[in-house]
Amino acid sequence: MKSGRFIGVMSGTSLDGVDVVLAAIDETMVAQQASLTWPIPVHLKKGILDICQGQPLTLSQLGQLDTQLGRLFAQAVNALLAQQRLQPRDIVAIGCHGQTVWHEPTGEAPHTLQIGDNNHIVAHTGITVVGDFRRRDIALGGQGAPLVPAFHHALLGHPTEKRMVLNIGGIANLSLLFPGQAVRGYDTGPGNMLMDAWIWRQCAQPYDKDAAWAKEGQVILPLLQKMLRDPYFAASAPKSTGREYFNYGWLERHLAAFPGADARDVQATLAELTAVSIAQQVLLNGGCERLMVCGGGGRNPLVMARLAALLTGIEVSTTDKAGISGDDMEALAFAWLAWRTLAGLPGNLPSVTGATEASVLGAIYPANPITQS
């Protein structure tokens, strides 16, 4: 089995930066050693948002964005190597999720598309890359997402305690870790995505720091109820979603019935939407003893307070309390998935994604032996 140092690279739906994590991994442990977040330039962020919202673009523009993101991911990896004074030969492989620009796992031709050319990452780092993790699961009839519940189970599963792990990124997803039961998990709906989109349009701020703006507003109950009637929330698992569905256009359609709504009230309502839609799914699955939160939403004090209030009797805390950085969880998961791919081990859980079978995931982009030796 391949073991040693791996690097995980994650650029999620929040677009708040490229998370890069260094970890030592083998069959018995995942030990995080270092991490950093690398900024995404404004022009790349705009290009990603345009695609995700269905804006037309040429194949040339898509190809350029693919290349530019691959180079950006390589820069982020090289920055971590320099920070830690490591050489390419010190790293077994990079697990790179890529940037999701479209996710449509149902219909006549299910598909998902992550860009950020892995060939450029190999060329500019000299390290083997494992990427394209989601499409094998979709080819096997699955949703292609979420993939992190398997990692949550490996790190945070407990033999007797009924736990759930909640990742609040752009989209929120829930992992159900119940003793004696198959792991389940799915996307509950919007996490930070709509809150970030609204404050960006209104205030040109990337996110609502400490929920300060939302705290100034009041929840618009009819708007909240209208949004919660979206059929996605009532759909049965397995299910997954993304920015191609819960985007600014989705929000605008719901706001059309509320002309003149105060911008701060809308922000407060979006925070409540995230908390309520998550809490409903926690309770629908019978609750748990401990809800462990990771992702950027774990730093939103309003969302965290509302979850605690809506889920009385459940301990709501971040994964940091368990010794695992909530900010680095997803990048760490893809480092682990790269290890599993190189070890010939399956990376998906059919009980989560709905795939017909467990499978080794991803494609391997080998480094030239002369550079990784």
Swiss-Prot record:
Enzyme class: transferase
Catalysed conversion reaction: 1,6-anhydro-N-acetyl-beta-muramate + ATP + H2O = N-acetyl-D-muramate 6-phosphate + ADP + H(+)
Signal sequence coordinates: none
Keyword annotations from UniProtKB, A to Z: ATP-binding, Carbohydrate metabolism, Kinase, Nucleotide-binding, Transferase
GO BP, one annotated term: 1,6-anhydro-N-acetyl-beta-muramic acid catabolic process
Enzyme Commission numbers on file: 2.7.1.170
MF GO annotations: ATP binding; kinase activity; phosphotransferase activity, alcohol group as acceptor
Homology family: Belongs to the anhydro-N-acetylmuramic acid kinase family.
UniProt-listed PANTHER family: ANHYDRO-N-ACETYLMURAMIC ACID KINASE
Protein name: Anhydro-N-acetylmuramic acid kinase
Organism from which the protein derives: Salmonella paratyphi A (strain AKU_12601)
Upper lineage: Bacteria, Pseudomonadati, Pseudomonadota, Gammaproteobacteria, Enterobacterales
